[in-house]
Amino acid sequence: MTKTVIYNIVLFWLAWVVIILSFQWIVTTRLKIKHPDLAVAWTESETRLSSNKGKIYLLEPFMNRQVAWDSEYYVGIAIGGYDDPEAGRVINPVTGNEVIKNYSFFPFYPYVMRVFALPLRLLGLENPLAAASLAGVIVSALGTLAGLLALWDMTRPYFEEEDSYRAVFYALIFPTAFFFAMVYTEGLFIGLAFGALALSKRGHWVWASILGLLAVWTRAHGAVLALPLLIFWLMQIKWREPLKPQMTWKWFLRGALALMPLAGYLLWRNSALGEGWAELQEFYFGRGLMSIDSSIEAWKQAFDYARYTGGGHAQIYFAIEVGSVLLAFIASLWLIRRDPGVALFSLAIVLLSAFSGSAGSMARYMLIAPALYIFLAQLGRNKMFDRTWTVFSILLLGMEASLFAVDMWVG
């Protein structure tokens, strides 16, 4: 990767961040969006003008357009830790125990936010809520930059330079790509996960495993990184040649490093944080590992709500969700022959998300599947597709970013 490539990507990324944040301010200043939102069955009661009353981490005016929904927990953990007395609590109906909702979220992102907030407070941003919110946006944006550089690098073996740039461009204009600059984990995650993929393809196993480990502690999907790392490890073997000389201690060490994301997940899962996460996922969020029956029922209910009850709000939301999943699924299958490791990582993201027991947030979850952008970049070789997709995607991106800025539900 040359200095020119880095310069071009950094410049485009910086312009994109400024445009996204400015656009949210412009739209919310110029327009008044009517509440509540009927996107899904539960949003009508959660998107009224008074719905955030008492949620102190969502009420700070500074950077408020970038803080909504799950941002509350990341800001709260960054300021007060997991046992923050201001955190929301729910009762487990099975045990009757009170559970702090902060435990639903992984630690690495909010802890990095805490680190970034320290110099901001020293520079005069003394309000801890404001400092944590700005830190969250900075961490997300920097993670996104790292992810874009890694995406460009991992596609170069089979793409022309123009195609790799196009993949980066499509990543930043995907309809839900604004999340990369919000107080959400997607930006940091693609920096770590895409970085791990790119480094492992280059043979930098130690750094790849470290990034993979940190990705695991950013969100649960990080555990899936063990799959592509193992594939890249096995691809080092020349199967038509004698195997014994190739199976050196270094080769076995690389295999062990490839398993680091899975080991990191299991370590975290058996900690107090992991136990709390699993408990909340089951009874509060209704999610689990490949919960196929409950997922089918959730998708059916979402379809019925969109068709019969929610009207245009729900139908558009549901169409974006389904469209994103189908596009990422097709992209993953298309990429298997060209780049099996990245393809299977993306496919695992799609399947684990779609069959998690819930039919929500799919368009956001698909953001972390690199095959999506690689497939679009291939299609974008056709100039008509490139122009058409660019217009369509940017218009949806603007709509989604605007809705998020006023606390409407977009995933």
Regions found by a protein language model. Name each.
Residues 97-107, 111, 122-149, 313-320:
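Loop-to-helix entry region of an early transmembrane alpha helix in multi-pass inner-membrane enzymes
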Residues 159-162, 196-207, 237-239:
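Membrane-interface transmembrane helices that cradle and orient dolichyl/undecaprenyl
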Residues 113-117, 135-158, 327-331:
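Transmembrane-helix motifs of polytopic, lipid-linked glycan transferases
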Residues 68-125, 353:
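Short hydrophobic/aromatic helix or loop-helix immediately within or flanking a transmembrane segment
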Residues 172, 176-179, 193-198, 206-233, ...:
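Membrane-interface alpha helices of multi-pass inner-membrane proteins
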Residues 123-134, 151-173, 339-344:
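Transmembrane-helix signature of polytopic, membrane-embedded enzymes
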Residues 182-188, 362:
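Short acidic/glycine- and proline-prone juxtamembrane loop motifs at membrane-interface regions
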Residues 19-40, 214-216, 222-346:
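Membrane-lumen/periplasm interface segments of specific transmembrane helices
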